[in-house]
Amino acid sequence: MPKIGPMEILIIVLLVVVVFGIGKLPQVGDAIGKGIRNFRKASSGEEEKEEVETKEETKTIEKSE
């Protein structure tokens, strides 16, 4: 399996910036993060527990704003 070094990571980041643009990077990062989180939940079987916690966190954030 090939190793991914700093130059390869830099090239990937530059390609992502070129394809999506600076303005969309937060949205893309959020979507990737949610996808990884959902994958981990599904693999560990804690999906239902996390949904309840996420809803509670959302309510807390909405109240603080």
Swiss-Prot record:
Compositionally biased intervals (Acidic residues): 45-54
GO molecular function: protein transmembrane transporter activity
Compartmental location: Cell membrane
Membrane protein topology class: Single-pass membrane protein
Region of interest: Disordered: 43-65
Chief localization: membrane
Job of this protein: Part of the twin-arginine translocation (Tat) system that transports large folded proteins containing a characteristic twin-arginine motif in their signal peptide across membranes. TatA could form the protein-conducting channel of the Tat system.
Subunit details: Forms a complex with TatC.
Protein's name in the database: Sec-independent protein translocase protein TatA
